[in-house]
Swiss-Prot record:
HAMAP family: Fapy_DNA_glycosyl. The keyword Glycosyltransferase does not apply. This is Formamidopyrimidine-DNA glycosylase. The lineage of its organism: Bacteria, Pseudomonadati, Pseudomonadota, Alphaproteobacteria, Hyphomicrobiales. Binds 1 zinc ion per subunit. The gene is mutM.
């Protein structure tokens, strides 16, 4: 499933293609994705101008000129592609040679841009993604967002904040980091990578990173820095392409070539001088990769 860096990459790819354009028609080629589309969805979007794109956690946000925001979640296999006029406007004939089967094109944004007509197509073979619509003023209280913690890239995330959340918690550290109420948008891949960078075991209790007085230990400061760094590195690399993720220009993210522990079971740990081996365990139904030698 695309994680925060992948969704951020998609947002950055779509912004120059969609921002400032008018939706001449929203074409729905079926009645639902994972969930049914909102009532009168096509009518409510058609004719509107897109004033901006954003992201919250793993959700893509498309702001319209009437004060509404379209919410899109990519699910397991969702992706967008951009087409100029009747042909692709991206290098490599992405939508012909590199796209998924066009029979899985479920939503088409027909756009009028200053340069001419354009289409942005949502493709989703597994149909595990979904779309919704909400007034921008109500976004923070929408069920998708009201319980989310701070973004891992924002100033709200700090060691002091996590100390408050983790204090006296026996919950495994990895599980605490994946809890979207603690940090929004942080997923399995990047939690594994951040824990490796900060030399912390995924199975240790989250509360052990907090002093008896409730202050963050130095290890928690290092963890916050590692989270920021791994997310920034992944965004710079275009995200990770595992199974189904494709960027809007058809290219594949390549941060997976920089994985230090994720999906490296039985391989040598990359911490200099460690000498350990990457192990795989299962926590809450998800694979965890870590080095028991240097992650404590």
């Amino acid at each position: 499933m695309p994680e925060l860096p992948e969704v951020e990459t998609v947002k950055r790819g779509l912004t120059p293609a969609m921002e400032g354009t008018r939706v001449t028609r929203l074409e729905l080629r079926r009645g639902d994705l994972r969930f049914p589309f909102p009532d009168a969805f096509a009518d409510r979007v058609s004719g509107r101008t897109i004033v901006g794109l954003g992201r919250r956690a793993k959700y893509l946000l498309v702001d319209l000129d009437d004060g509404n925001t379209l919410i899109s979640h990519l699910g397991m296999s969702g992706s967008f592609r951009i087409e100029e006029g009747a042909a692709s406007g991206v290098p490599g004939e992405f939508h012909h040679a590199r796209s998924k089967d066009e029979k899985h094109d479920h939503v088409v944004f027909h756009l009028q841009a200053a340069s001419g007509l354009r289409r942005v197509v949502y493709n989703d073979p597994r149909r595990f993604g979904f779309m919704d619509m909400v007034g921008r003023a109500d976004l923070a209280t929408h069920p998708f967002f009201r319980d989310l913690g701070p973004e891992p890239t924002g100033n709200e995330l700090s060691a002091a904040y996590l100390a408050e959340r983790f204090r006296d918690k026996a919950q495994p550290l990895k599980s605490a980091l994946l809890d979207q109420k603690n940090i929004a948008g942080l997923g399995n891949i990047y939690v594994c990578e951040a824990l490796w960078r900060s030399h912390l075991s995924p199975i240790r209790a989250a509360g052990t990173l907090v002093t008896a007085g409730g202050r963050p230990k130095a290890q928690l400061d290092l963890l916050v820095a590692s989270i920021r760094d791994v997310i920034a590195d992944a965004i710079a690399a275009g995200g990770s392409s595992l199974r189904d993720h494709i960027q809007t220009d058809g290219s594949l993210g390549y941060f997976q070539h920089s994985f230090s522990v994720y999906d490296r079971e039985s391989q040598a740990c990359r911490t200099p001088g460690c000498g350990g081996t990457v192990a795989r365990i299962v926590q809450a139904g998800r694979s965890t990769f870590y080095c028991a030698t240097c992650q404590k």
